[in-house]
Amino acid sequence: MEKLLMTNTLWNSVDELPIHDSWKPVLKPVEDAIRKLGVFLAEEEFLPPVDDVFRAFSYPFDAVKVLIMGQDPYPTPGHAMGLSFSTQPDVRPLPRSLNNIFKELVSDVGSLGDSASEQGALDLGINAPGSVAGTQVALPADGDLRAWSNQGVALFNRVLTVHPGQAGSHKGKGWEAVTEQAIKALAERDQPLVAILWGKQAQEVQKFLGDTPCICSVHPSPLSASRGFFGSKPFSRANEILSSLGATEIDWSL
């Protein structure tokens, strides 16, 4: 029976995955786990769309220099697109956690000093903070974070799928082994890496990161953001660490 079921899978091998070639040998040790997840998902309604599940692995393995960990995809249909915290460009209003990330982004390395930025805040449903002198990043135009990924920011979720409307529903289904393998491989390279870990679930992966510098705070959720996320300056701190390691800083503007 198991062999029969295994033929009905979304992914038979790592080589079939829509990922960058440099990730394929990294994920080869968890190929069986990925195949079994494909069996589970073949009979399950899930988000994000199947072609986006492995989007975080579509960027070069060797280019990663910042890791931002999420928990699982947004459970609202149309929001999740395979990168932690990121949304499709047309999503309005923003998910509340991303709303708070953008508030901290602007407070840390950005400014809302002009009327266009103020209007953008209203369009996105963000309560715009005051201007911050001497900073460079304007309010993002939307919730699409691919510009970060293009610079080497790995936007990983611990669990890569979710049942629509049921946050956390695919926890314990096998994704943890896959992302553990990926995180360990990133940490074991002889290359600069900084991890940004928001919330207890994200901080559970710290044990896989060896001596990788980690920037930790509470989660940007509205339930916790005021208890240490706001004011934590993760973006400027990450750049300071990258600079100290001889790596190019991230341009956090979107």
Curated annotation (Swiss-Prot):
Reactions this protein catalyses: Hydrolyzes single-stranded DNA or mismatched double-stranded DNA and polynucleotides, releasing free uracil
GO biological process, one term: base-excision repair, AP site formation via deaminated base removal
Presence of the UniProt keyword Disulfide bond in the record: no
Active site positions, chain numbering: D72 (proton acceptor)
Pfam families, per the entry: UDG
Any single Gene Ontology cellular-component annotation: cytoplasm
EC numbers on record: 3.2.2.27
Region annotated Insert, chain positions: 111-136
Annotated InterPro entries: UDG_fam1, Ura-DNA_Glyclase_AS, Uracil-DNA_glycosylase-like, Uracil-DNA_glycosylase-like_sf
Tree of life domain: Bacteria
Intracellular or extracellular location(s): Cytoplasm
CDD domains named among the record's database cross-references: UDG-F1-like
Keywords: Cytoplasm, DNA damage, DNA repair, Hydrolase
GO molecular function terms attached to this record: uracil DNA N-glycosylase activity
Family: Belongs to the uracil-DNA glycosylase (UDG) superfamily. UNG family.
PANTHER family: URACIL-DNA GLYCOSYLASE
This protein's name: Uracil-DNA glycosylase
